[in-house]
Amino acid sequence: MHTVKLLCVVFSCLCAVAWASSNRQPCHSPPLTSGTMKVVSTGGHDLASGEFSYDSKANKFRFVEDTAHANKTSHMDVLVHFEEGVLYEIDSKNESCKKETLQFRKHLMEIPPDATHESEIYMGSPSITEQGLRVRVWNGKLPELHAHYSLSTTSCGCLPVSGSYYGDKKDLLFSFFGVETEVDDPQVFVPPAYCEAVAFEEAPDDHSFFDLFHD
């Protein structure tokens, strides 16, 4: 009888832990983050690698591709103001700019509010000092894009670790390295003066952050 009672108590506790985990609310990114972001296709093709900066309060994102990356004739430099729904493609060498509308504003720098907490796991070793990292795994759907995603963040601090996007058009894998909770130059979120007079180009309603990365 005591054994049965003990098993019931243990089972109840495990259920409570599982319920609490599945109902965990999405964490929020620090006000400012920066570091290196690499994007590859699930087929193993390198799509982009460079420095990112993110302002979570203003929901602004800048990504400047490493000019040494691959054998490309042009390299990505994009600024996205998600709240305003504006995407800038910047060519600082020629001082030219392309400005597009962005109707779909979800992205993997911020966990969507309707994301589901999947699990909390250790990467590496939990028992050896400085040899492990505890991360939380979140996932969800993007029905407007006929896609779904998964995003891993640090348990303490909500820093991005990795992400994946699976859609009808493409599958993408994101990795983040050397992430800091600061941005050296806040001006990276301000479009260059030569972008001001550029007219908007209307983009489809399903045009998204994920369309930036392609073969």
UniProtKB/Swiss-Prot annotation:
InterPro entries hit by this protein: Ependymin, Ependymin_CS
GO biological process: cell-matrix adhesion
Major location category of this protein: secreted
UniProt cross-references to Pfam families, sorted A to Z: Ependymin
An MF annotation (GO) of this entry: calcium ion binding
Tissue expr: EPDs are synthesized in the meninx and secreted in the cerebrospinal fluid.
Any single Gene Ontology cellular-component annotation: lysosome
Transmembrane segments: none
Coiled-coil annotated spans: none
Modifications after synthesis and translation: Binds calcium through the terminal sialic acids.
PROSITE patterns: EPENDYMIN_1, EPENDYMIN_2
Glycosites: N71, N94
Subcellular location: Secreted
Signal peptide range in chain numbering: 1-20
Swiss-Prot/TrEMBL keywords: Calcium, Disulfide bond, Glycoprotein, Secreted, Signal
Subunit structure: Forms disulfide-linked dimers.
Protein's job: May play a role in neural plasticity. May be involved during axon regeneration.
Family (UniProt): Belongs to the ependymin family.
Name of the protein this chain belongs to: Ependymin
Organism: Cyprinus carpio
Primary gene name: epd
